[in-house]
Amino acid sequence: EAGFPISSPGDFLSVVEISKAVKIGVCALTRSKKEDIDVAAEALHHAKRGRIHTGIGSSDIHIKHKFNSTREKVLEQGTWAVRYAKNKGYEVEFFAEDAGRADLVFLAQLVEAVIDAGADVVNVPDTTGYCLPHLYGKRIQYLFDHVKNIDKAIISVHCHNDLGLATANTIAGLMAGAR
């Protein structure tokens, strides 16, 4: 992941130049907004294999307080963003921000919907570093047990180290089936 192109001219230029210089995949981070995805696609123009990494909050606390939204609107926005990014011709990775605190039934519903929309990779972040390893592993296992189309995408983890558990949580996620 080479940068967040819409965040600054420097990040945009970094993604452009890295895309020109390397022969491997290059990823650009976005929010689930049209302008973010458009700018990321432009920055990835020279990439041999580009990926747009887009997403939205999945926990009720993020949905209500960060996005002033509802679960239904998050489902709609997330699937729209995946389809829009996919139509740019790049691989798409979706992040379910704050998945560590998300309701598991809703998280599974969101993951299934974005895979149906075309996500190649679904990232399950412990955004706040809130999870303990055994619980994070169970969270990933729940997705593998309840998302019908989970075999159509790569499930990845992204654990923060607020409690010093990022490595342990990552290993727990991998042991539960994430890659």
For each feature predicted by the language model, list its residue ranges.
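Glycine-rich phosphate-binding "P-loop"
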Residues: E1-A2, K66
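Alpha/beta enzyme core
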Residues: P9-A21, K34-I155, N169-A178
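A glycine-rich helix N-cap at a beta->alpha junction
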Residues: V26-T30
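Active-site-adjacent loop and "lid" segments of alpha/beta metabolic enzymes
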Residues: C159-L165
